[in-house]
Amino acid sequence: METIDGATTGARLPRLNEPAPDFEATTTHGVVRLADFAGGWLVLFSHPADFTPVCTTEFMAFAAIYPELQRRHTELLGLSIDSVSAHIAWVRNIEEKTGVAIPFPVIADLDRAVATAYGMVMPGESTTETSRCVFVIDPIGRVRAMIYYPLTTGRNTEEIVRLIDALQMSDARQVSTPANWRPGDKVLIPTPPTVETAAERMTEEFASRTEGFERVDWYLCTKSVEAV
């Protein structure tokens, strides 16, 4: 069992490709449930506290990418161990001071139920602050990616968009994406599973029937694909 400051939580932390922990929570947009996001992608992220400088810049950055995420059938859901009133006051203050409206809901996780289920409170850290966590949940409710940032470091939100693009490409085309991949770049062809298919990968016949095919060796080949 996982512990937080020596206390047993009884919660099993999420794992990649397993069902995301279910939840029902109060937010700045009313009560939300994990099931509300079924059929689309969800980026669930936590921040340490309202009215703090790094978190404020992150919320502005998340607001900036929100239209891009929606075009990818992806929703945003924030979380911290603060009250709804604190969340509302903070997002209103952000808009008043910067002109940036926060369009997505923010969970008020005062009982730490969601934070505990998702492992957002680090052992040895304050139990009233969540770490900078990001969970990507797919349309059938599986955890597909998890990212943890230190308290001092704001997140790169464009990387989150890139991650969504890569996951959606992999699901749609049954391919992998190389380092620093962006939409429009070539993708990686899955490694051959047998000696025979590895040998076939080295033939000109295979190359001729694969659009945009490039080969470094039998295990490292790329091809062009249409956008998802």
Question: Where do the PLM segments sit?
Answer:
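Chalcogenol-based redox active-site neighborhoods
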Residues: M1-V228
